[in-house]
A protein has these predicted regions:
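Flexible, glycine/small-residue-enriched loop-and-beta-strand segment within the central core
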Residues: 1-83, 110-119
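A generic "structured core" feature
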Residues: 72, 78-80, 86-96, 104
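Short helix N-cap motif at coil->helix boundaries in the Bergerat
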Residues: 99
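Acidic, glycine-centered active-site loop in nucleotide-sugar glycosyltransferases
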Residues: 102-103, 108-111
Length: 119
């Protein structure tokens, strides 16, 4: 956590090796979630609107991340700020999640094609 960031992890969650969770605002993870190796979760991003100011001096924008109960997040997944992942969802290895997923979603990346469907 950084600054006033809040992290809540539910019961019976498993995190494999090298997972990273960085909260400047809030990250909430439900019960019975499984995370593969090297999963990254960020609730913030660097600001970069002022081209005359170094990016590292422009601060951050942040928005809560929520992962509901019984989700399986595969290895090397990146979850970005503001995302809400509905319960019983599966995210396949190597996917970058940048928008909300409804409950019972399955998300996989096949080369350059991203497929989202109901479970």
């Amino acid at each position: 956590m950084e600054g006033n960031g809040k992290l809540k992890i539910g019961d019976n969650c498993f995190f494999n090796n090298y997972c990273s969770i960085t909260a400047r605002d809030s990250i909430k993870i439900g019960n019975n979630c499984i995370f593969g190796e090297n999963v990254k979760i960020y609730d913030h991003n660097h600001c970069y609107n002022d081209k005359d100011l170094l990016i590292c001096k422009q601060g951050f924008s942040a928005k809560e991340v929520v992962i509901e109960d019984d989700c399986w997040i595969g290895s090397n997944v990146v979850i970005l700020k503001g995302v809400h992942i509905g319960r019983h969802s599966v995210v396949g290895a190597g996917v970058v999640i940048y928008k909300d997923l409804p409950a019972n979603s399955v998300v996989v990346c096949k080369q350059s094609l991203v497929s989202i469907k109901e479970r």
